[in-house]
Amino acid sequence: MFTSVKKFFGIHEESDEILYNQLISLLEKLTRVITAKDSDKKEVEKLIDKIKNTNLFNQSDENGNTTLILAADAGLEEACLKLIPKMSDEAINMIENIRGQPALVKAMWRDLDSVCIELIPKMSKENINAIDNCGRTLLMLAAKKGMTTVSKMFINLMPPEMIIHADNEGNTTASYADTDHAFADTTKTIKLLQEKLLKSLASFINKSFLKKDHVKKGVDNFFKIVWATKFYKKIKVNKELLASYLQEQNNDPESTNTPESMIKTMNNFIKLHLFAIAGVCKIIQPAFETSSLHLSCLPKEAICCIISHLENEKWGVDAVLLGEN
């Protein structure tokens, strides 16, 4: 009786469970081969089409693998394209436990451009801006793979600091794009953007820390702290590349500033002042707008940035000791 009722309402839980288990078993097998046979690909696609209870596709196994992660890992483009519209965004963003990668990264390693293009708009900011243990971004991987359309999509979604980010070895996205001359279009796009952003950053640093007229106009330490915090917390750049642009900004013949001394100045400034300021920030609730430069008038985001910097970074020393310096 219950079986007939399920069929009447279009519920296929029992048969779907069996089909789903068959699908998982086949996908796991295909992740262990270099290239799947066409017959196996077709079987996977057939099983996906047969499963009516799409909630099953949102499940993950004990290793955090979803059907989409397994399909992407196996390089099954058509299977991935069938799965994506059947899954929730939350399931699409799931990360497996072994390598800590979502389906998007698996698809990128397998050169599944069309799958990546479908996945990127559904990915969370955290996954888009993820950095691995080697300091590499997804944009770096896309550049290395010569995925021009995918690279441009990342550029449109990423903040500037992620685009000019340097990995643990000091390599930039442009460095990754330049590893294969066949990817000339991707390389050119990224190099031009990197140059533009580094020049902008150099100008920003120069205006924040060198220009005497800014001090005369009343730009005080609180704003300087916010700018410096944003620089150090969010931006990890190749210091050698940045130095050349800083040198262009520093065109005062009487100035003794060097790129290295400028960066050191910012470093020392934050270490000396930021911890004490953060304690004040935590009890301030800015509730009005004014042209005053008082700390209580800083945007809430700026205050959160300062607090977050202290709580997460602490400059490698104990927080109490930092506050005493």
From Swiss-Prot:
Signal peptide: none
UniProt keyword annotations, A-Z: ANK repeat, Repeat
InterPro entries the UniProt entry points to: Ankyrin_rpt-contain_sf (IPR036770)
Domain of life per record: Bacteria
ANK repeat copies, ranges: 63-94, 99-130, 134-164
Protein's name according to its UniProt entry: Putative ankyrin repeat protein RF_0011
